């Protein structure tokens, strides 16, 4: 049953992302079920970022990385009297820190580079991400390529800084991903 859910998630990768925006919008507006932290996540940081952490690619990466943790570790922890939660907290999460950092970096980059999603849920210009701000700048000031390229260059600095500080864990997760244990 677990594999059926996983493969149906993988099948959803074939659906264009733009088509999934409408159901996401209905959820964020609070039309489908009540949300924590208020009736709607429109014009909020939660509405802008939370949908990117449920990305199917991120779920796929986490599953594949955690799946390669040897069963012998669970057997040894169970013999020591560890519960499922204790095993998750003390063994799985520390061993998975490289992939957790990697998927967090991917989620940040997805949210940072998003364009259509912020246009749908944000009305306040002070919440606009860089991509939408650059688009608004072009609409108001015209196409001045020197200013456009300067703004685009400035927009990549946070991603580069984040990658610089997480580079060791990022490369560790990539190098360990294909190894069979």
Task: Briefly describe each language-model feature range.
Residues 1-181:
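A hydrophobic, multi-pass inner-membrane permease signature
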